[in-house]
Amino acid sequence: MSRHSLKVLAAAALAVCGTQSAMAQSAALIAAAKAEGQLTTIALPHDWCGYGAVIAGFKAKYGLKINELNPDAGSGDEIEAIKANKDNKGPQAPDVIDVGLSFGPSSKAAGLIQPYKVATWDSIPASAKDADGYWYGDYYGVMSFQVNTDLISKVPTDWADLLKPEYKNSVSLAGDPRVSSQAIQAVYAAGLSAAGGDASKAGAAGLKFFADMNKAGNFVPVIGKTASLAQGTTPIIISWDYNALAGRDTLKGNPKVQVVVPKSGVLAGVYVQAISAYAPHPNAAKLWMEYLYSDEGQLAWLNGYCHPIRFNDLAAKNKIPKAMMDKLPPAEGYAKAVFPTLDQQSAYKEVITKQWDTVVGANIAK
């Protein structure tokens, strides 16, 4: 037998061994997770990013119970839940978190999360993950206006429109900008538009924008939700496009809803997954991560209008059904999307969370 043939056989044998090893590892993880009996999640509303279907899919596949904590929590609340339950292995201690990108590095630095690399690790873009596996991007979207067109006859097309008198008592955020990543990003996006795209000035400009909107009486200081949109309490909600589109589908035309990607200040936001350093069910947490980053989990997010972090990999392998692609908004709305760097996010997060009370002075009711 030639040396070339031996090399081919050796390579094939290694591939088989690698596959068998991965299968054995997977079986061992499943068994360990089932022995723990459950997974505790936090801040996962079922209408956010298709999480209802994601959770149902995980339960059906592995038969694990999921203890769902505080679906309406913001990223800051998730971090506080880990801190508050460091010495608690009970039902209030989250195993996993899904937070805004800027919360990943800070959580790692604070020793609140632990490293784990999923099987599909290599297909996650390097720019969207911690090199050591402490956190990695899960999905992204762009900031949008969700508008109840039964009540708002002239739909706003850009941020500056929201300051017009015709939108009095109409505009809300989908979270509290002192703790919610979604709301922090909304304030920054408004500032990015007001500052002509200057990232260094956008945080302060965003606060001024909302201060002006609040003084004009256009800002409604409650967390906007699908129900408040339909009732007319918050006929315009600034939120991620995937939440707005899911809300539109939920309402089924009653009332009619239009989702607008603004002409300027088009902000893209990445969220990240991580496992708590104090997870009561660490193996269930790892199995959850494996599920989320599998083709099945990634497509479940896409079905909920979120662009999964492995989107390009799935598209290259023709894994995305055409019907799913057809449900997404037109690509041109995303052409001007800006992905802020981690340093930029850390800077404007600090400005917005610390200065909201003094500059805007609006206390957000839940």
Language-model segments: what does each one mean?
Residues M1-M23:
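Gram-negative bacterial Sec-dependent N-terminal signal peptides
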Residues L267, Y271, S276-A337:
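Mature extracytoplasmic/periplasmic domains
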Residues A227, E332-K366:
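Conserved C-terminal helix/tail region of periplasmic/extracytoplasmic solute-binding proteins
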Residues I42-A56, N67-K83, G90-T233:
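Extracytoplasmic ligand-binding site segments that recognize negatively charged/polar headgroups
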Residues Y140-M143, L207-D212, K252-A279:
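Periplasmic-binding protein-like
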Residues M23-T40, K59-K61, K164-E166, K366:
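Immediate post-signal peptide segment of exported/extracytoplasmic ligand-binding proteins
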Residues G104-S106, A230, P235-P255:
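A ligand-binding cleft/hinge motif common to bilobed small-molecule-binding domains
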